[in-house]
């Protein structure tokens, strides 16, 4: 195949390690499926933890038992979310680098998706910081603020899915 045909077809542009031969194997499909499962599981935690924060912000100061129960739930969920985040990111990195998904000309959607992932990592970190503040006895924001905060991962998921499926640029 001549070089001009390779350049015009983003799926064939890479050589060597990013060879198109590695792109569409059954193994890659398993990696992709596991990536989706771990992403969905991580997002479930990103959706639910701020709901626990809403309840923590609304709990009465004299309800020590309820506060401790909610804190225990939040702590366990945050740990579980972090464990799910690691393989989600690792498998995504594998798909991106080893299989060359999103590499090459005309793949600006991948740069935008990676920015979305960085923002999600920041959101995850902020959730951990808010949890520590609750554990220290501080109520950093109102329950209304946490209801709005809860919508952030929904918007980020919407952006990521549109970028991956539609590939607008």
Q: Predicted segments — roles?
A:
Residues 19-23:
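Generic detector of N-terminal low-structure segments
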